[in-house]
């Protein structure tokens, strides 16, 4: 079993309030959950309306499958024109 986690730091240039931030972040998190069947969460940064950190994770029996799913999730995040991706990072974990 392998777990692959993706961390994404975003800049949200059009946000003027927490409500604006949620309006931009929610479709990304919920869309990734629905389309790719991954765990997805807003990891914080709610005190800074123009920034967001998102986390995504997939559990799989194969490295290749996990990598393919997370590649799709990353492309999905990049497809939102109203955000800027500042940084991404991946973490692998293997279980028994």
Regions found by a protein language model. Name each.
Residues 9, 42-46, 67-72:
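A general secondary-structure boundary signal
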């Amino acid at each position: 079993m392998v777990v692959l986690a993706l961390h994404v730091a975003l800049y949200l240039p059009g946000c003027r309030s927490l409500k604006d931030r949620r309006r931009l972040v929610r479709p990304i998190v919920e869309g990734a959950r629905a389309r790719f069947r991954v765990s997805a969460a807003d990891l914080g940064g709610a005190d800074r309306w123009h920034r967001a950190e998102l986390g995504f994770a997939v559990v799989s029996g194969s490295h290749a499958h996990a990598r393919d799913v997370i590649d799709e999730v990353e492309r999905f995040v990049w497809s939102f024109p109203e955000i800027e991706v500042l940084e991404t990072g991946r973490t692998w974990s293997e279980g028994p």
